[in-house]
């Protein structure tokens, strides 16, 4: 059995070795062929699990998708319920609280606006006062040299007037002397 030309090899039994080459089927009888075919089917059913695994995989995927769909439907239903509850109960409460708070915030805002308006008025008045003081100081700064110049001109005019008066007095005195000389003749 262990000779080199025996159908038995170290890889398996002679029956399995005879199954591997399909061209040996023609040399065997028809009953043997049917037996080998049945054994091949039994072998594929017992040892080849691919169709079973594929079927189980399809079944698992189908069940998973159904359960997932149901779970998602439950999640969506819960979400719809919570949204409708929020719309019916929480939203009106929030709206009422917001309206109440909005009124107080509006009053505070109006008060702050009025206060800021008063501060702006004060600031404007202060700026006008500062501008007025600056204008007054500038006017005084121009006024003092103007008054000094006017005083200088007045003195000059007074001096010229005094000199003119003195000339006229001298002239009248000389005229009177001449007149008195002429009258005495």
Curated annotation (Swiss-Prot):
Compositional bias (Polar residues): 1-16
Record keyword Zinc present: no
Protein name per the record: Biogenesis of lysosome-related organelles complex 1 subunit 5
Keyword Coiled coil appears in the UniProt entry: yes
Function: Component of the BLOC-1 complex, a complex that is required for normal biogenesis of lysosome-related organelles (LRO), such as platelet dense granules and melanosomes. Plays a role in intracellular vesicle trafficking.
Keyword vocabulary terms for this entry: Coiled coil
One GO CC term, this protein: BLOC-1 complex
Coiled coil: 98-182
